[in-house]
Amino acid sequence: KHKEKNALRLHFTMDDNLALDASIKARYESMYSGVFYQRYIKGLWVLAEGVIYQAFTKESIVPTVPRDYSKYIVSMDYGIQNPTAMLLFGLCDGVWYQVDEFYHSGRETGQQKTDEEYYQDLCELVGDLPVRELIIDPSASSFIALVRKSNRFKVRKANNDVLDGIQHTSTIIQERKLLVNDCCTRTIQEYGLYSWQEKTSNGQDKPIKENDHAMDA
């Protein structure tokens, strides 16, 4: 194809860079998995297909036990018709643990919740833990206004770049800097189901918009 298009095709990998020693190459190789490993390490522009978080295995799931967390945050995917997911994370010895989760689907339960009810669910999830901030989609304007009015949580609006988020999450899973307590059953289920679309009209990488509410959080 490159001859037909009068294009020059170059392929190289880290092994072609003589300035990189073995330890640096090993570190970079350990950072990626799945499609990102094939692209960034092997230099192969392969299609994004299959399960997105291939590095998430049974070793990524840990017992729900007390730990000496130094910091807590909550990340939230807010939905009205779609499910709402809240994920509680704690930092311990340089590793982020998903400590607990909240998940509610109005469609599944037949019960839609108000902003006030979701705020109560957030407070129950957190309890008396010193949660520093809530990370949430900027489009959840009414809920953000309610949280700010309560003056308990600092709000940080999430970056909605999906591919950057997937790449970052893939890296920290691969490096075992993100682990999930076994009580977070919805999240664990989504890690096993969250997949790439087989083909998009413009050739862009996109996840299937299913089994993605904990993933979006």
Regions from the PLM with identified roles:
Residues F12, I41, M86, L134, ...:
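A residue-level signal for conserved active-site and pocket-lining positions in enzyme catalytic cores
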Residues N17-M76:
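ATPase catalytic-site recognition across NTP-hydrolyzing enzymes
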Residues A7-H11, I73, V155:
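Conserved beta-strand scaffold positions in the cores of enzyme catalytic domains, especially
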Residues K1-D15:
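Signature of the SF2 helicase/ATPase Hel1-core->accessory helical subdomain module
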Residues C92-K209:
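Mg2+-dependent endonuclease catalytic cores in nucleic-acid-processing enzymes, primarily RNase H-like
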Residues R67-L91:
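Gly/Thr-rich phosphate-binding beta-strand-loop-beta motif of the actin/hexokinase/Hsp70
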Residues I208-A217:
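Charge-patterned, long linear interaction tracts outside catalytic cores
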Residues L10-F12, I41, V99, A158:
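Hydrophobic residues at beta-strand termini and immediately following loops
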